[in-house]
Amino acid sequence: MEDKKCDITTFGEILIDFTSQKPNEDGQMLYARNPGGAPANVAVAARRLGARTAFLGKAGKDMHGEFLRSVLEKEQVDTRGLLLDEKFFTTLAFVEVQESGERTFSFARKPGADTNIQKEELNLDILDHTMIFHVGSLSLTDQPARDTTFYAVERAKKNGSIISYDPNYRASLWRDEETAKIQMRSLIPYADIVKISDEETELLTGYKQVEEAAKFLHQQGVAVVAVTMGEHGAYIYNKDGGVKVPGFAARQIGDTNGAGDSFWGGFLYRICYAGKQLKDLTKEELEEYVRFGNAVASLCV
């Protein structure tokens, strides 16, 4: 592949995660403000490993949007494609973290700035010169972001980028499950690489078993499929078949928020520097990349 200005460009939601903490002495629940949004997290994770990354998206021109931009700039992620819009608020997510590390979400996004990005607002200098273009599914919940997502994916693919897709399901952001299923599946024909969790396999493919789901996606034209399985690691599938790759023990059981994004940032980083076309990568090489991603994720828990 010809040299590109960016190794990985991500597009989609950037938001604030207000993550639950221990109650104060009066019993009031406290929340910590953290930068969030799966695509933005992936860009940061890959940049920390040394990849050249950029983010395309929109936040509000408010205290939260300014904070998010400063975080990406501090992490040395290219922010020329991050717009701050005074007409819309930055999306907020309230995250309840259980003792097990599992999470429940509530969103303030009616509408959020991230759902109001127009295709005319995309930074084409970045979009047209990236090796990997990564998107999620939360930009498909509302217009105009949905049309902008398809425009960006089609343009990047035409320009030779590898399309990476993470259908990240958040039930409360969709009108109903059937709508989510239709929209989330609509990007699969464009994807070269797909990451899903074992909780999303049935929704996205109709198959609950990770092996069957991965095989189905590969038959739909996806070259590489990764299914994350929490503490049990991940399952990787390509033309050579599939293999389960065990995870690493976390330093301690805690907040799992962002672990999957860190895994994917690590995996895409290895894809970037493989020195091979995606179709030429062996199952053994991909297994090594998954192991690397698992190690990165374990450091985030």
Where are these regions (language model features)?
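Conserved N-terminal subdomain of the carbohydrate kinase-like
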Residues: 52-135
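Short beta-strand/loop segments at the ligand-binding rim of alpha/beta enzyme cores
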Residues: 162-167
